[in-house]
Amino acid sequence: MTPTTTPVSNPDALAPGTQDVHTLKGTLQRLAPGTPLRDSLDRIVRGHTGALIVIGDDENVTSICDGGFEFDVPFAATRLRELCKMDGAVILSSDIERIKRANVQLLPSPTWPTQESGTRHRSAERTALHTGVPVIAVSESQNTITLYVEGKAHMLEQPSTLLNRANQALGTMERYRDRLDQVNNRLHLAELHSYVTVIDVVSVIQREEMLRRVGEIIDGDVLELGKDAKQIQIQLSELRGDNDRERESIIADYLVTDGIPADEEIYAALEAISHLDDKALLKPANIARILGLPPTEEALDEPVAPRGYRTLNRIPRVQKFLMDKLIVEFGNLDALLNASVEDLSAVDGVGSLWARHITDGLGRLS
């Protein structure tokens, strides 16, 4: 499940003012199987002719074009394939609706760094860095398609390869989801009966992050597969569930802060967890440290008390601002569970209807 996108020699070295013209994600969507441009690229690969294609015709591009001939004709897969039989580059409009030039010699600055060895790929990489627009190189000898964009080199893979990898990743994700559900249910019971320990919390956070990571890998394959990924998208959505909201809720419950944690503090903790490598993620002490809890082996069995966000999150239609009001007033889940309808309705902004709804919901959960 190793991604095929690799950084170029200097990923931050893009021409001024061009960084936001095109993105890797947006370009991959336009190169997905079944799109006109991908159809043309597949024809070129089968014909063993090679190609150099620039997606964009702004001033940055035209300033490095030499020779060839200019015209302005509608894009067609067969037309692009025929034009790519010539030695030079083909220039497309940014929306890939028209072919603007053909048989062009590209003259990007030779000072742009490149890790490529072949002439076509060196020119493609330097042109992408110089202009900030996506450039595609099709290898005549290796039958590969490489996209250069946003300072990255991304080799396109065959749909069958992507499908196999995505299906394998879905199997892994299904195992992660099963294990997450187990530790999640165990934590939920511990929260309701006031015997939560640090390791209970850490175990859930670890598995939520593992689920998120494998989901991101599948997202990349889904993006490249385009319409061929519909079934995978359905399975991915089912396995992912509401993982993002659940991750926020558990951090809100257990992050050590003065008072209830601010959104910025929650997102900072999630960001810190996402930056842990796979090996570091498996060490409970690293998660405990991010939460502000003692990162020692002995402290993992220490009791901790949830604020109540995770449990309130299980009650339909209870919004975050109501949760904040209740938790500010009662302090933790145990106090919330012992509160009466009258106690809840006395909180500013809650009212009797919400108080009854929340009390009934807590009763069902416990």
UniProtKB/Swiss-Prot annotation:
ATP binds at G88, L106, T119, R120, H121, R122, S123. Transmembrane segments: none annotated. It catalyses: 2 ATP = 3',3'-c-di-AMP + 2 diphosphate. InterPro entries: DisA, DisA/LigA_HHH, DisA_sf, DNA_integrity_DisA_N_sf, DNA_integrity_scan_DisA_link, DNA_integrity_scan_DisA_N, DNA_integrity_scanning_protein, RuvA_2-like. Its cofactor is Mg(2+). Disulfide bonds: none annotated. The keyword Nucleotidyltransferase applies. It holds the Pfam family DAC. GO terms for biological process: DNA repair. Signal peptide: none annotated. GO terms for molecular function: adenylate cyclase activity; ATP binding; diadenylate cyclase activity; DNA binding. Belongs to the DisA family. Participates in a DNA-damage check-point. DisA forms globular foci that rapidly scan along the chromosomes searching for lesions. Homooctamer. This is DNA integrity scanning protein DisA. It comes from Corynebacterium glutamicum (strain R).
